[in-house]
């Protein structure tokens, strides 16, 4: 007695490649079964055929032969049920493979559409060159700002030096003006002394004239008395002196004294006048020198004030330029930070997509390996090898995925100018 059964189903494709063809030549042995599995490549049909041939020796009795036929029929029926169950399971697995294939194709279409929508892979090297150029510009700007700050400090120090010089020159000017005031007071005192001496000289001259007049009056009066006197006195006495001679001597003495006094007064007056003239000349020369110094100091002060004003204007201009430069580079840094954050976010999204696709591919690969293992199990079963039901049970594995997100922020003056996220997936 022999029985045969054939099951036809479609083949499956996992990961874009068909399963390999499995075939086994039928083996015919007494009291055993022969099976063959044919799986077409490239989507062709698969056939599982089972045949059982049993031979009974002619020397046995009919009763034994009937019992053997009953037992053999029961064994064949059990094998049919087992094969039916296995075929159903295989069909369900193949159906699952087809569904996974269709899902894989859908994912490939979605990935292709997403890639086409996003366009070709971007070349980031121009951005790197731009970033390097911007870094160099920022560095050069920092150096320029440092130089400007140094120039501002130098200008401030120069302005402080000019201010100190200006204050010292003002102090010198005030002291010179004080000296000029003292010299003017001295000139006034000298003029007063000169006027006093002139007055004294005039009074002495008047007194001299008055003395001369009195002396002449006395002489005239004495001569008149002598002339009017008629008394002649003769005494025996020493010879009297000549009054005319005495008067002449007195007149000569008075004239000599008056001339001497006049000369002394004139000499004193000339010496005083010469001293005051020298002093006045010295004071005038000092005054002229002081005026020249004051004029020079005033001119220097005006030039210093002009230079100070120009330095202030230059400082204000440099500060405005520095402020504009800082604002412009802060804006550029903010724009670059936003671009870098967008690029990093896109990079993280691409990495996550790659990891998700890798996980899906790994799941499909595991399913393919399970199906290949089950096909090998079917093959061993159909070839007559020992079979354990646990070999057909799919192995359930548990995988723990740990995602670590690292956020890096760049702070400038307490403000976030750049932020990057790095996602790391750890499987265990």
UniProtKB/Swiss-Prot annotation:
Name the SMART domains for this protein.
Answer: Filament (SM01391)
Region Coil 1A, residue ranges: 79-114
Post-translational modification, as annotated:
Proteolytically cleaved by caspases during epithelial cell apoptosis.
Under the heading InterPro entries, the entry gives:
IF_conserved, IF_rod_dom, Keratin_I
Any idea where the IF rod domain is? 79-389
Q: Where is this region: Coil 2?
A: 247-384
Question: GO MF terms on file?
Answer: structural molecule activity
Free-text tissue specificity from the UniProt record: Expressed at high levels in notochord and low levels in adult liver.
| Chain ranges passing through the membrane | none
Q: Which Pfam families match?
A: Filament
Among Gene3D superfamilies, the record links this protein to: 1.20.5.170, Single helix bin, Vasodilator-stimulated phosphoprotein
Q: Site annotation (Stutter): which residues? A: 329
* Record keywords, A-Z: Coiled coil, Intermediate filament, Keratin, Phosphoprotein
Annotated segments matching region Head: 2-78
Report residue spans for region: Linker 12: 223-246
Q: Which GO terms describe its biological process?
A: intermediate filament cytoskeleton organization
| PANTHER family in alphabetical order | INTERMEDIATE FILAMENT (PTHR23239), KERATIN, TYPE I CYTOSKELETAL 18 (PTHR23239:SF349)
The record's similarity note reads: Belongs to the intermediate filament family.
What does the UniProt function comment say about this protein? When phosphorylated, plays a role in filament reorganization.
Q: How does it assemble?
A: Heterotetramer of two type I and two type II keratins. Keratin-18 associates with keratin-8.
Query: What's the miscellaneous note?
Result: There are two types of cytoskeletal and microfibrillar keratin: I (acidic; 40-55 kDa) and II (neutral to basic; 56-70 kDa).
Protein's UniProt name: Keratin, type I cytoskeletal 18-A
Q: What is the lineage of its organism?
A: Eukaryota, Metazoa, Chordata, Craniata, Vertebrata
From the UniProt record, report the name of the gene that encodes this protein: krt18-a
């Amino acid at each position: 007695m022999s029985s045969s059964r054939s099951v036809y189903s479609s083949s499956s494709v996992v990961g874009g490649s068909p399963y390999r063809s499995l075939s086994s030549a039928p083996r015919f042995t007494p009291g055993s079964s022969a099976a063959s599995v044919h799986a077409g490549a490239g989507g062709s049909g698969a056939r599982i055929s089972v045949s059982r041939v049993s031979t009974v020796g002619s020397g046995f009795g009919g009763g034994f032969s009937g019992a053997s036929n009953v037992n053999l029929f029961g064994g064949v029926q059990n094998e049919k049920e087992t094969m039916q169950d296995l075929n159903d399971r295989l069909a369900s697995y193949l159906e699952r493979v087809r569904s996974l294939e269709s899902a894989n194709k859908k994912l490939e279409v979605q990935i292709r559409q997403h890639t086409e929508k996003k366009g070709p892979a971007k070349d980031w090297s121009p951005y790197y060159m731009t970033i390097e150029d911007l870094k160099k510009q920022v560095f050069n700007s920092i150096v320029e700002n440092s130089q400007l700050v140094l120039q501002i400090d130098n200008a401030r120090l120069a302005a402080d030096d000019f201010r100190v010089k200006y204050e010292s020159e003002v102090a010198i000017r005030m002291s010179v003006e004080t000296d000029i005031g003292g010299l003017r007071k001295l000139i006034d005192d000298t003029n007063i002394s000169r006027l006093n001496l002139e007055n004294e000289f005039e009074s002495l001259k008047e007194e001299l004239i008055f003395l001369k007049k009195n002396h002449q009056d006395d002489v005239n009066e004495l001569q008149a008395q002598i002339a009017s006197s008629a008394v002649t006195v003769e005494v025996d006495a020493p010879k009297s002196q000549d009054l005319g001679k005495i008067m002449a001597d007195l007149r000569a003495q008075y004239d000599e004294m008056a001339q001497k006094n006049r000369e002394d007064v004139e000499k004193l007056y000339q010496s005083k006048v010469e001293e005051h003239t020298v002093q006045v000349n010295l004071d005038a020369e000092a005054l002229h020198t002081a005026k020249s110094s004051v004029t020079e100091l005033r001119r220097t002060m005006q030039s210093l004030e002009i230079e100070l004003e120009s330095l202030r204007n230059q400082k204000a201009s440099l500060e405005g330029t520095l402020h504009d430069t800082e604002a412009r580079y802060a804006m550029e840094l903010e724009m670059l930070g936003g671009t870098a954050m967008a690029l990093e976010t896109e990079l993280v999204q691409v990495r996550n997509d790659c990891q998700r696709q890798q996980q899906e591919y790994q799941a499909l690969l595991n399913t393919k390996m399970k199906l290949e293992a089950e096909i090998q199990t079917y093959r061993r079963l159909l070839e007559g090898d020992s079979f354990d039901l646990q070999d057909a049970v799919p192995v359930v594995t548990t995988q723990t995925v740990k995602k670590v997100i690292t956020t890096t922020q760049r702070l400038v003056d307490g403000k976030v100018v750049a932020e990057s996220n790095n996602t790391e997936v750890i499987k265990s």
